[in-house]
A protein has these predicted regions:
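Acidic catalytic loop of the alpha/beta-hydrolase fold
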Residues: 256-261, 288-289
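Catalytic histidine-centered segment of alpha/beta-hydrolase-like enzymes
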Residues: 285-299
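Short alpha-helix in the alpha/beta-hydrolase fold that links the catalytic acid
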Residues: 239, 248, 262-271
Length: 311
């Protein structure tokens, strides 16, 4: 090979190398942008709050009648929750809120259970409300926080019986917690309302809906950034896999008109669950609106489920 050919080959290799670097750099930028857009609680943007229909009357009740409690997470964050003590001894509900919301978003659910005698605990998820944290975990790191909240309740009251109750991201959180090997046996049942199968599935759907993009390569790049910045992987954050492991009776609820967390996810979750299970479909309800749209259907189903599984 003559000198000219060698120089040409070197130039071509340099160009290819630079193009690869540019492509990798572009992927990192895209991944970082998506991470900031979707998982940074302080950034403007995101997919919008999954608060459903919020009633200020219940928020006022919660803020007036509750006391503040705190917990240090496994990774050192100070987490906040509202607690309202109920009339029935040893009966507790841990209620988990949705994406870009806070504990007050679960006030109406908390009031219903409080009226049944439950002591209700409404945590602010990490990165939300008054809890520390600089990222949204979409339920995966929060599942460990839920286990810790349960352990704290049991340390105070070894005879505690607990229901985990979540809406939207909170529903994914309690499903993910239900598959943990160290979930206390005092957790008697789980109620999930419009939770997603996995973070990957949910983000894939939102990418297509909002930007017309496929998951590859955006989510792959975002997953790498998430591992670096938040310490968890989007690919491992699966409620579907966790309910396969769960032995805790679970009520699956979904609004038939939900497009934010698509209605088809209900059946996949329900079929995957290996625990004792029930299902409630709410006609006409969009995302996180089932209780408000059809209270005459919703609350009797919830109450009957609780009556079967809480002493």
């Amino acid at each position: 090979m003559n000198k000219t050919a060698i120089c040409g080959l070197r130039a071509a290799l340099v160009i290819v190398f630079l193009l690869i670097l540019l492509a990798l750099g572009a992927l990192i930028l895209v991944g970082n942008y998506f991470y900031t857009f979707a998982l940074d609680p302080n950034a403007k943007g995101g997919f919008g709050s999954a608060a459903g229909i919020v009633d200020s009357e219940y928020t006022r009740w919660l803020l007036k009648d509750s006391r503040d409690v705190s917990l240090i997470s496994d990774d050192g964050l100070e987490l906040h929750a509202y607690r309202v003590d109920g009339s029935v001894p040893h009966r507790y509900a841990v209620l988990c809120h949705g994406y870009q919301n806070n504990a007050t978003g679960m006030a109406s659910y908390g009031k219903h259970l409080f009226d049944l005698g439950y002591t209700v605990l409404l945590p602010d998820a990490r990165g939300h409300g008054e809890s520390e944290g600089d990222y949204i975990g979409m339920g995966w790191p929060e599942r460990r926080d839920v286990v810790r909240w349960c352990q704290q309740l049991i340390a105070e009251d070894p005879a505690a019986e607990i229901v985990l109750y979540g809406v939207s991201m909170g529903a994914a959180t309690v499903m993910m917690a239900s598959g943990e090997a160290d979930l206390p046996v005092q957790v008697r049942c789980v109620i999930e309302d419009c939770g997603y199968t996995s973070v990957w599935d949910e983000f894939s759907g939102q990418l297509k809906e909002l930007f017309g993009l496929p998951p590859f390569p955006v989510l792959n790049a975002a997953d790498l950034v998430c591992r670096i910045r938040a310490g968890y992987s989007i690919t491992e954050a699966s409620a579907l896999r966790q309910v396969e492991r769960s032995v805790t009776p679970t009520l699956f609820i979904h609004g038939e008109e939900d497009t934010f967390v698509p209605f088809w996810m209900l059946e996949e979750l329900y079929q995957a669950a290996s625990c004792e299970k029930e299902k409630l479909v709410v006609p006409g309800a969009a995302h996180a609106e089932s209780a408000a749209v059809a209270p005459e259907l919703y609350w009797p189903a919830v109450d009957a489920f609780l009556a079967r599984h809480m002493a």
